[in-house]
Amino acid sequence: MQEYYLNSEKKICLMELSEFKELEGAYPHKRNLFRSMNPVQYCKAESYGDCLFGTMKIPRALKGRVTYIVFGFYLRGEELLLIEDGSFLKTCLGRLEKIIPTECSMHQFLVMIFEMLIEDDVIYLQQQEEKLASIEEELLKKIPEHFYEIILQYRKRFSAYHAYYEQLVNLADAMQSDFGQILTDKERSLWQLYANRVERLHDHVELLREYLVQIRELYQSLIDVQQNKVMSILTV
């Protein structure tokens, strides 16, 4: 377990799931979070009184396949627990240490982590759009082999990101509604800005999915034209 301090009162603990299981002290609903992490199913946040906890499941496309980074979080008072068996959060915390404002609340810090998770997603989605445009251009020149396998990879990828952003929108809404009374105006504003940004990413994925459908329809129309030519030759 590693400990980080925003100041003398605000503590962040980074630990593995096994360490969280054995953690002693007053952590209401700890068992609920532990169950939610075996395994992590999706992004969510739950609140009970002054206790907030949840899980994150972040898709990452690697060599055509979708993999996931998962972790849990538990916030109570001035203590934030981050639970992960990998090294992703350690890297995030190392970066955040350099940019944390002098007066930073725990909710602000949590938003900063969530913002870091999506900071490069706009670029990634733009790259996906460019790749689809290239596929469309090549399709007009020559019908490629294994077209459906290629399209299937993109469809799985976009479905994963579509679900992810939808979950993040719900999570941000829950943060504002369930904790609205104890959040400061600045904290509410940060969560709203985060929700707006995620909604734009969600809309971008929607457009990519529609673009993919158009490419598939173009492919089918080209196949139909090709088959009609063959049939006309055979008929003659």
Residue map of PLM features:
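A generic short alpha-helical patch detector that favors 3-5-residue windows
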Residues: E84, P101-T102, Y124-Q127, K186, ...
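Short, charged/polar, low-complexity loop and linker segments
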Residues: P101-L110, E137-Y148, L183
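Helix-boundary and N-terminal cytosolic regulatory elements
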Residues: M1-C104, Q167-L183
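Membrane-associated alpha-helical segments
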Residues: E145-V236
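A ubiquitous short alpha-helical element
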Residues: E79, M116-I123, K156-S159
